[in-house]
Amino acid sequence: MTGKHVAVLMGGFSSERSVSLSSGVACATTLEECGYRVTRIDVDRNVASILVELKPDVVFNALHGPFGEDGAIQGVLEYLQIPYTHSGVLASALAMDKDRAKKVAAAAGVVVAPSRLMNRFDIGSQHPMKPPYVVKPVREGSSFGVVIVKEDQPHPPQVIGSADWKYGDEVMVEGYIAGRELTCAVMGDRAMDVCEIIPVGYQFYDYDSKYVAGASTHVSPAKILPNIYQKIQTMALTAHRAIGCRGVSRSDFRFDDRFSEEGEVVWLEINTQPGMTPTSLVPDIAKAAGISFAELLSWMVEDASCLR
């Protein structure tokens, strides 16, 4: 028995609430099995008061989306001086902003796709760049709001400028990179295996293919050339360090090998709060490296600190 009291934060009030609840329950259950004393907290606006009264030894942050991974809850935990998992205030805020995180990664030598930051209302009826391209909300996760504009579309989709859009006015318009979906997790200061994601019946790795059982296949380690494998690991670790991440992060890539085995590798984004659901990538990647889910979570708890 470890004796440590771990508060697992989950749920919250972002668009990724259901994903967070799934992550939180899986993590809390496994940590209990590891011998930790666990309190599950479905986060609301009173979370600071709850934590002051609870006085946990460590907070395991299983929140996703705004407030959970944008530096906000991290700032609360720093103020309360409660050690916590994952990245700190600055890295969390930076990584949540796809455009700014991309600029920092590119400055560190990571290969990125061409893009521009826009207000969604400025897109109008004319293409902001030559199709195909992707429109992404700047501060959303789980592929919420991602729109792929194909070459044969005469105009941008109307939903981007409509009242139905609920992902903020700032969007990133990014050149579409064809090819295979690859991802690489970083644990501490170590790049783990590269994993290929193969969506089953989906155009890309969207919300359903991420969280619906059987909607995607994870191949870890990915079947790619050794030099490409190492290149992806290097870029994942470079982005992790440049953005200032701590604990576990996961970087997503596109690998276009349609015309040669060497192909082209492009970094897409980094996730400082990767999912920990039964269908999530990081647990699968860790398992392929011989690290069980319990060992992964225990390492994260023991790695927790303030001033991250």
Curated annotation (Swiss-Prot):
<keyword id="KW-0573">Peptidoglycan synthesis</keyword>
<feature type="binding site">
    <location>
        <position position="269"/>
    </location>
    <ligand>
        <name>Mg(2+) 1</name>
    </ligand>
</feature>
<dbReference type="InterPro" id="IPR011127">
    <property type="entry name" value="Dala_Dala_lig_N"/>
</dbReference>
<feature type="binding site">
    <location>
        <position position="252"/>
    </location>
    <ligand>
        <name>Mg(2+) 1</name>
    </ligand>
</feature>
<feature type="binding site">
    <location>
        <position position="269"/>
    </location>
    <ligand>
        <name>Mg(2+) 2</name>
    </ligand>
</feature>
<feature type="domain" description="ATP-grasp">
    <location>
        <begin position="102"/>
        <end position="302"/>
    </location>
</feature>
<protein>
    <recommendedName>
        <fullName>D-alanine--D-alanine ligase B</fullName>
        <ecNumber>6.3.2.4</ecNumber>
    </recommendedName>
</protein>
<comment type="function">
    <text>Cell wall formation.</text>
</comment>
<keyword id="KW-0133">Cell shape</keyword>
<dbReference type="GO" id="GO:0008360">
    <property type="term" value="P:regulation of cell shape"/>
</dbReference>
<dbReference type="GO" id="GO:0008716">
    <property type="term" value="F:D-alanine-D-alanine ligase activity"/>
</dbReference>
<feature type="binding site">
    <location>
        <position position="271"/>
    </location>
    <ligand>
        <name>Mg(2+) 2</name>
    </ligand>
</feature>
<dbReference type="InterPro" id="IPR011761">
    <property type="entry name" value="ATP-grasp"/>
</dbReference>
<dbReference type="InterPro" id="IPR016185">
    <property type="entry name" value="PreATP-grasp_dom_sf"/>
</dbReference>
<comment type="pathway">
    <text>Cell wall biogenesis; peptidoglycan biosynthesis.</text>
</comment>
<keyword id="KW-0963">Cytoplasm</keyword>
<dbReference type="GO" id="GO:0005737">
    <property type="term" value="C:cytoplasm"/>
</dbReference>
<dbReference type="Pfam" id="PF01820">
    <property type="entry name" value="Dala_Dala_lig_N"/>
</dbReference>
<keyword id="KW-0479">Metal-binding</keyword>
<dbReference type="GO" id="GO:0009252">
    <property type="term" value="P:peptidoglycan biosynthetic process"/>
</dbReference>
<keyword id="KW-0547">Nucleotide-binding</keyword>
<dbReference type="GO" id="GO:0046872">
    <property type="term" value="F:metal ion binding"/>
</dbReference>
<dbReference type="InterPro" id="IPR005905">
    <property type="entry name" value="D_ala_D_ala"/>
</dbReference>
<dbReference type="GO" id="GO:0005524">
    <property type="term" value="F:ATP binding"/>
</dbReference>
<keyword id="KW-0436">Ligase</keyword>
<dbReference type="InterPro" id="IPR000291">
    <property type="entry name" value="D-Ala_lig_Van_CS"/>
</dbReference>
<keyword id="KW-0464">Manganese</keyword>
<dbReference type="GO" id="GO:0071555">
    <property type="term" value="P:cell wall organization"/>
</dbReference>
<keyword id="KW-0961">Cell wall biogenesis/degradation</keyword>
<comment type="similarity">
    <text>Belongs to the D-alanine--D-alanine ligase family.</text>
</comment>
<keyword id="KW-0067">ATP-binding</keyword>
<dbReference type="InterPro" id="IPR011095">
    <property type="entry name" value="Dala_Dala_lig_C"/>
</dbReference>
<keyword id="KW-0460">Magnesium</keyword>
<dbReference type="Pfam" id="PF07478">
    <property type="entry name" value="Dala_Dala_lig_C"/>
</dbReference>
<feature type="binding site">
    <location>
        <begin position="128"/>
        <end position="183"/>
    </location>
    <ligand>
        <name>ATP</name>
    </ligand>
</feature>
<dbReference type="InterPro" id="IPR013815">
    <property type="entry name" value="ATP_grasp_subdomain_1"/>
</dbReference>
